[in-house]
Amino acid sequence: MPSHAKSSLEAGLVALKQGNYQTAIAQLEPIASSQSNATASLQAQVGLVMAYARSGEVPKAIAFSQNLIESNNPQVQEWATRALEHLTKRKKPEQESKKVETGFVAFENSTPDSTPDSTPETPTFEEKPNEQVIETKSDDIPPMVPLAKLKATLATPPPPPTAPLSGFMGSVTRTQAKLFGVIYWRQAQRARAWQPLRKPKLIPLRLLSAGTFIALFWVMREILKLAMGFINQTLVKLPYLEPLQLLYRDPTQVLLIALVILIGVSPWLLDLLLANLYGQREFPKDVLNTHSREAVRVLQRCCQQRHWPLPKLRVLPTAAPIILTYGSLPRNARIVVSQGLLEQLADDEIAIIYATQLGHIAHWDFAVMSLLLLVTLPTHKLYQQVSELGDKISAKIWRWPVTILASLIYGVWCLLTGTALWLSRLRLYYSDRVAAEITGNPNALIRALLKIAIGVAADIQKEEETSWQLESLNLLTPVSYQQSLSLGTIASNLSFESFLKWDTANPYRRWFTINNSHPLMGDRIERLCQIARHWHLDTELHFASVPSKVKRQSFLLQIAPWLGIPLGVLFAALVWITWQLAFALKFLNLKWIYEDWSFITGCLLIGFSIGTVMRINSFFPDIKPATVQTDDSLPNLLSDPSALPIDSISVRLVGKLLGRQGTSNSLAQDLIFQSSAGLVKLHHISWLGQSVNHQDLIGRQIIVTGWFRRGATPWIDIQTLETQSGKTIHSPHPIWSTFLAVAAQAWGAYVFLTG
C-alpha cells in the first residue's frame, strides 16, 4: 500500500477511536473507494460503517454494510449481515455518550498482495514484524473482537508472504502489542430468572482433597527420608565428622504435625511469600467496583447468605490474567487477581470469575491447595535462584553441578505439584457449576475462560517465555498456561468450536489428561453450555455432534507400553502356575521363583519394553518431503477430533523459537514454537556432544521438523531445529525410546533370572 494511503488509513482509524467521526469519514472514504488494495478497502469500509452509525447517518452506514455483504470473505459477510440487522431495526440514533468498544478484525484468506498495514510486504527470515494497535468505539454494529467485552488480543508474527494473510483489526487495549485475527463473540445472554441446579455430590471432591493431602505428605516424607539418609551417609564417609543421630529418626509424626500447622497459618505465610516474590498488594473493594460492580455485589451477596466475612482482596501487578484463592477457613480466605485480568475481562466476566473462587471456598478444596502452594512456592523460588546462580558461572566445570542441582530441584517441584493434579482438575468442574448458579450467566464464564487463555498466550508471546508467575501459580489458576498456548492463539485461523471439537468428541480424550493440571477446556465449556440450555439460553459456543472416527487399534497402540505392564503381570502368573505344575509333577524345581517374588518386577519391565518396541515405528515414522505438512495445515491438524498422538503427522514449520534461556531451561521444559498459525509446545531431548545447544536458538527464526501430536495439549516432537545460517540441532526421540526399551528389557531379564 502506498505510504500516503497507509497514513490516511491510520489517521482515519485513530480519529474513529477518538470519536472524531467526520475526520474519520474524510480520511477513510477515499481508501474505501480505492481498488488498489482490497484489504485496506475493506478495512476502511468497516470503519465507515461505524463512523456513519455513530454520527447518526444511518442510511450511509446501511449502504456500506450492504456492500460488505457482497464480499467474498465469509467472515466479512457475517459481520456485515449482523450490522445491517442492527441498523435497520434501529429507530433513531443512540446518544453518542453511550460508547461500546469494538475493533477491526482479521479477514482470513486475504491474497498475498493485500498486505495488512502492520506487515512488511517482503519480510525476511529473521525480520521482526512491525506492530500496530488500533482501538475504536461504536455502539451501532454487532460485536466483532469482543466489542466492549474483550479488551485484549494476542501478539503474533505475520505469516510468510506465501501464507494466507490474516490479522486485520482487533479490539485491544494499549497494553497489548500486536493484532491477532478474528475473534467473534456471540454475546449470548444471561438468565434473568433461573431454577437452582441439582446439588452435586461432593463426596468425590472431599475424598480427593483428603487423598491429595495424604499423597503430598507421603511424597514429602520420602523426599525428607532420602535427604536425611544422604546427609548422614555423606557425614560417615567424611573424616572427623559424625552422623547426626537426629537424622536417623522417623520424620513421620513431626512432618504430619508440621503440615497441619502450615494449613492453619497458610493465609499469612502466603501473604508474605506472594508480596515478596510477585509484588502482591491489597486491593480495596472500591477499586474492584470501578472494574466490575457486579463482582462486588456477587461477593457481598454470597458472603451474606453463607454468613462469611468478605474475603480479603489482593492484586498482582502482572499483565497475564490470573486469579487464585488461598486460605484455611472461609473467614481468612484471600482472593488474588492480576491487573491483566481486570483489564482484559468485562464486568460480568470478572464477576463470574470471582464467583468461581467462592466455589473453591464453599467446597473447602482451597485449604489443601493453599498448603500445596505454600510448599511448592519456596521450592520453585529455590529452583529459580539456583538457575540464576548457574547463569552467572562462566566456567563449564562449575556450571554443570549447578545445572544438575537446579534440575533436581525442578524435579522435586514437579513431584510435589503432581500430587494435586487430579484435585486441580476435578475442583474446577465444581467451581464452574457454582459460579454459573450464583450469577445465572454461564455464557460469561465461557467468554472469560477463553479470554484468559488469550491473555495468557499474549503474555507468553510478549515476554517470549513462560513467566515464573504463570509456572509457579499454575495449579491454582482457572486456565493452565499449557492449554492456553494453542487455544489462545488460533482464533484468527480457526473457530473455538473447531479447535475444541477434540475436547468434546474424541472418545479417548480423558486418557490424555492424566498428567494435565487442568481439565479439557472443551469439556468445561460443554458442561457450561448444558447449564445454559437447561435454563433455555442460547450458548456462546455451539458444538455440533461429531461421530467418532478413532480406530480402537490406534488407541491400543498408543498405550502399548502401559498395556505391557498388566500383560507382564499375566505372564508372571503364567510362569508361577507353570512352576507349580512342574513342581507337583517333580519335573522341575524353580526354587528362586518360589522364594523371591521379585520376578514379577522383571515381568513388568519386560512387558513395558515389548510395548515400547511395538510402538516405536508408528510413533516415529520416517519424515518424507512429499507428505510433510506446513504452516497452512496447522489449523486443520488442530481441528481434527479423531486425531491421536500416535498418528504422528510429519510437519515442517517456519517460525520463532520461544522459551526461557539459561540454566532454568536446561531440560528444555519451556520450548514453544511461534508460527503464523499460533503457538505450539515443543518436546526436545538434548543430544550429548552437539556443538549447538537448543538455547542458542531461542528468540531466533527457525525451521522445525518433527512429528505433530494432537493430545490434551498439542505438541511437536522435534526431529531437527534449523536456522537460516545452516545450524541444525537434532533431537533423538527414536533413539532414546529404543534405549529405554532395551534398558527395560535388560533390567527385567536380569531381575527375572537372578531374583
Regions found by a protein language model. Name each.
Residues V287, Q339-I352:
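Short pre-active-site segment immediately N-terminal to the catalytic Zn-binding motif
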Residues V337, I352-H360, W364-D365, L428-D432:
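Active-site recognition of the HExxH zinc-binding catalytic motif
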Residues P2-S34, L42, G56-E57, A63-D113, ...:
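Hydrophobic or amphipathic, alpha-helical segments that drive membrane association/targeting
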Residues L358-L374, N441-N443:
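Catalytic Zn2+-binding segment of zinc metalloproteases
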Residues I323-L345:
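Active-site scaffold of zinc-dependent metalloenzymes
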Residues D271, L299-C303, S424-L445:
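An active-site-proximal "capping" alpha-helix that borders the catalytic cofactor pocket
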Residues V375-I397:
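Post-HExxH zinc-binding segment in Zn-dependent metallohydrolases
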Residues L310, V315-R331, E388, K392-K396, ...:
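Active-site-proximal gating segments in proteases and membrane effectors
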